[in-house]
Every structure is written in structure tokens, then in C-alpha cells.
Amino acid sequence: MYRPEIKVVDCTIRDGGLMNKWNFSKEMVKEVFHGLAQAGVDYAELGYRVDKKMFSPEEFGPWRFCDEKDLRDVAYECDTKVSVMCDVGRTDYNAFLPADESIVK
């Protein structure tokens, strides 16, 4: 039975990053996003958005930080919405663009 109130969230990149410190290539993340979009997944959680003052970009890959530019390099406007996870106390919420300017929805 189809239930439109149920939404599907894929966290492959965000959760998988726990194993490799979010060191996925942009090409791989782009392919994952495209596959999710083709499959009709509602939300693609592409990583964390944490403050670079707390975590070193030399130690962690780009999906630990989810800069807007990196997200736009791999995702595109479609029915699948881009999401990121935030941890209270580890995120600079001022770094988020307003929703109407961001690919993160």
C-alpha cells in the first residue's frame, strides 16, 4: 500500500563515512545521489555539517563538512532533497545559507 506520508531517507554517505572519515570521491557521491534520485528516494543525507574549527579538513574528507559548494558539485535540483546531519555544539549554524539559497532542504 502506498503511503505518501512516509518518507525515505538514505544515509549511505553520512553513515558510511564513519568507516573512512568521509573520504569519498565527489564522483562516487555524485553517482550515489544520481542513483537515489532515479530510485525516487525522498532525502539523500550526504554527510555532516560540522565546524572546521573543531575538526581538521586534513584529517577528514569533505562529507564531514558538507560545504555548499561540494554539495552543489554532486547534487542537483530534483525530487530527491539534499540533507545533512548536524551535531549540537559541533556546528556553526551561521554557516547555513537561507533555505531559498541552499541546495540543503
Spans of model-derived segments:
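Active-site beta->alpha loop and helix N-cap motifs at the rims of alpha/beta catalytic domains
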Residues: 37, 43, 48-105
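Short amphipathic alpha-helices and their capping/turn segments at secondary-structure boundaries
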Residues: 1, 30-40
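A short N-terminal beta->alpha junction/helix N-cap motif
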Residues: 17-24, 58-62
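Residue-level marker for well-ordered alpha-helical positions
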Residues: 6, 30, 68-69
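Short N-terminal helix-initiation segments at or just after the protein's N-terminus
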Residues: 20-26, 48-51
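N-terminal small/glycine-rich loop or linker at the start of catalytic domains
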Residues: 1-21, 77-81, 94, 101-102
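Glycine-rich anion/phosphate-binding loops
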Residues: 22-31, 101
